[in-house]
Amino acid sequence: MIVKVQGGGKVYANTGSCSDVVSYLQHEDAERLQAGLTPEPFFNQEQDRISPKEVTNKIDNNRKGLKAKEAKFYVITVAPSRAELREMGATKEEQAAAMKEYIRTEVMPKYAEGFNKGLKADDLEFYGKIHFERHEKDGEDLHAHIIVSHKTKNNGKSISPMTNHTGKKNTGAAQGGFNRKEWYSS
């Protein structure tokens, strides 16, 4: 499984509203409707069907205390290998359902734990979107994008996957940084 935190530039610009990212992540919806297929909605830890408006509202209003030029959210891409996709199911629908479950039970819990702040996936404000096509890549196409807030769901803690893991105590009981290498390899 390839897991990557996207940079904050171009379509993934993250210092303002997430509306452009939410809009971009819907690019497959019109194509799927034209083909007679159901668009894949946004999802989070608890729900399978979340409107783009709600995603934008929740992420954009979860930024208490962040500076103007500070990232407000991050975008994570999760892409399974061909073998992993086969294990997820025979149809695209089965694979999409398995991918959502994988994100809920593996990716986001490990992401939360990676901050060493006693967080769980339920503490995160995140929204995922399954995509079935990748026009610029060869090979298997199914992948997911996850928009995750820079702040925990209760606006209480600032968390960034871009901080470097130090393994040292910074203040109080919290350890500094986020160990991306350990998270990516799990």
Task: Kindly label every feature range from the protein language model.
Residues 1-186:
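N-terminal nicking endonuclease/strand-transfer module with a His-rich metal-binding environment
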